[in-house]
Amino acid sequence: MDISVIDATKVNAETGLHIGESNAPVKMIEFINVRCPYCRKWFEESEELLAQSVKSGKVERIIKLFDKEKESLQRGNVMHHYIDYSAPEQALSALHKMFATQDEWGNLTLEEVATYAEKNLGLKEQKDATLVSAVIAEANAAHIQFVPTIIIGEHIFDESVTEEELR
């Protein structure tokens, strides 16, 4: 994945799901798609460290659910529409459930994914096309093509980021 073309100055800390204190000194911006296996790996492997950093007030996570045109990621696009951005803790819990059950819903039809989100995960569809469009426009302006893409200040990481690099 070529992250050298990404322009981090085109990324904002406003749009997205905010986890943690808004006055935290470090803003971590994460472009992810919940159907992507590399995003699941990133989410699960970084969760403990990030939870501690958020709890201690050092980091605010801004998670940007990035709808992708790639056929294999379209199921993630459907799931993204079940995240309630107005309730960050519940939204983070929903992301955990989505990643934990990715193997169950990941090959369903798009309609079946929506049903799975409602019946199996107990989620309600959130209609926020403006936010979805804003994340896509932001990613395009910054030349972000792949997920996961993690931006911390001027530093840009992909799925190969290590825990040591995050510290």
Language model features: what each stretch is:
Residues 28, 36, 150:
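Conserved S/T- and glycine-rich ATP-binding loop of Class I adenylate-forming
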Residues 32-35, 40-114:
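Structural alpha/beta surface segment adjacent to cysteine/selenocysteine redox centers
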Residues 31, 42-50, 115-167:
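C-terminal cap of thioredoxin/glutaredoxin-like
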